[in-house]
């Protein structure tokens, strides 16, 4: 889903916990993602990993984190906001803010919290 919105490519594919040599991984966790890196512009990437309950990770969906995207243009921010927030919950719509930027915050349809920020350039509205 995220690649379809942001574009880009997965660097080196997906690495799974079952790929760790000699690791004792419970069967139900072997196909969880150990590392993935989505590069969607020369200066922007998102890296991710699944949680591992067997390692003591406790998942608390909701306000446990936000992914923040700094975007290249006002239009790119609007497009990312519209696509990522569809079916989710909008906290703050994509709009001009007092700190001279366009900003939005929301949860996507998977419950992941996002912030999108575009800093306006001089003489840009």
Q: Can you say where each PLM-predicted feature lies in the sequence?
A:
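Glyoxalase I/VOC metalloenzyme domain signal
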Residues: 1-92, 105-125
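Short, small/polar residue-rich loop motifs at catalytic or cofactor-binding pockets
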Residues: 98-101
């Amino acid at each position: 889903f995220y690649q379809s919105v942001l574009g880009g490519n997965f660097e080196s594919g997906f690495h799974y916990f079952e790929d760790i040599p000699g690791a004792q991984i419970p069967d139900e966790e072997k196909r969880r993602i150990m590392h993935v890196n989505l590069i969607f512009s020369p200066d922007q990437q998102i890296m991710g990993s699944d949680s591992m309950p067997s390692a003591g990770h406790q998942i608390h969906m909701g306000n446990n984190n936000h992914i923040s995207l700094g975007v290249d243009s006002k239009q790119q921010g609007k497009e990312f906001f519209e696509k990522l927030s569809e079916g989710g919950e909008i906290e703050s719509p994509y709009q001009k803010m007092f700190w001279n930027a366009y900003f939005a915050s929301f949860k996507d349809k998977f419950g992941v919290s996002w912030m999108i920020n575009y800093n306006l350039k001089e003489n840009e509205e």
